[in-house]
């Protein structure tokens, strides 16, 4: 299956913290050569899986879950983060389902601002539904420190990138345990803060040791 949907990440020129509260960027300049990117060798990356029931995608999703997983945090230490995971209501194709990561826009910096703790916005629900109907697994990370212990390092490109790459690795691990095949092909799309995160994920995609397209 070819990657056709939303291959371009949109980086907003203006980023605002809304309803949930304020914060500031602690990110330094992004490097252009991530040759020193550490590969993900985290053992047993899945911590727990819970049902996500705040939004009903039953017509196109076989499963909607909140995945707690291990990732490499901004401090260089292993931390836990959360991500929404949606699987299509159709069998995997030959080679497995490809993965699309939805990188959410700015929501705030408090734990209650984590997207997994609320219903999806209508536009996000529509996007994810279309991706599922097209046969993609959708992974939607909350990002480091949103909904889990620790500070959310807003606009830290490496933290955002590793939140994404490590969520993809953990999702594949979780689905493989259930004999559900996923392709090595994956891509990230997003807007606002998510556009920044998507660009970071592309830069540090080698961490996942898969096939970023």
Predicted regions and their residues:
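C-terminal motif of bacterial Sec signal peptides marking the signal peptidase cleavage site
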Residues: 16-19
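Catalytic-loop region of hydrolases
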Residues: 21-92
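Active-site glycine-rich loops that stabilize anionic/oxyanionic intermediates
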Residues: 72-74, 104-109
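Short beta-strand element of the alpha/beta-hydrolase
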Residues: 82, 95-107
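Cap/lid segment of the alpha/beta-hydrolase catalytic domain
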Residues: 107-162
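Alpha/beta-hydrolase active-site loop
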Residues: 154-177
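Primarily recognizes the serine-hydrolase "nucleophile elbow" in alpha/beta-hydrolase
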Residues: 170-213
